[in-house]
A protein has these predicted regions:
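Positively charged, small/polar-rich N-terminal and surface patches that mediate targeting and assembly
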Residues: 1-68, 72-85, 92-123
């Protein structure tokens, strides 16, 4: 649950997570438009040539760091964004690189860390 509270011209954001160790999103965006790269803060000059974006979210959020390492070592992906506070991970590569990175992530966290994982989805 996200809540935004305003107090004397200050904004405070409250994020709450449900207890558990889980990957809640593992998605491949194949052939995304260049605008999507820009809106995500990725450099289309570098990242667009590979033509796929991988997105994951995880709790506990610090696991995103481990997931980034696994994806980089398992395939030729380029790291786009890691947020250890929200558990978001974005990376780019060819469709097969992104697929291999996501599969390696899910296999590791499921088998070694005993996380609950979701299926990989693709658009």
């Amino acid at each position: 649950m996200n809540e935004t509270m305003f107090d004397e011209n200050r904004m405070r954001i409250i994020q709450e997570y449900v207890p558990g160790c889980q990957v809640t999103l593992a998605h491949i965006i194949a052939s995304p438009d260049k605008v999507l790269y820009q809106k995500l803060g990725l450099d289309p000059k570098i990242d667009y040539q590979k033509a796929a974006i991988g997105i994951t979210t995880v709790t506990p959020s610090e696991t995103a760091i481990i997931m980034a390492d696994i994806a980089m070592k398992a395939s030729g992906i380029t790291l786009g964004f890691v947020d250890r506070f929200s558990g978001s991970l974005i990376f780019t590569g060819t469709v097969s690189e992104v697929q291999a990175g996501l599969e390696a992530i899910l296999d590791y966290v499921k088998d070694k860390l005993n996380y609950t994982v979701c299926p990989i989805t693709k658009t």
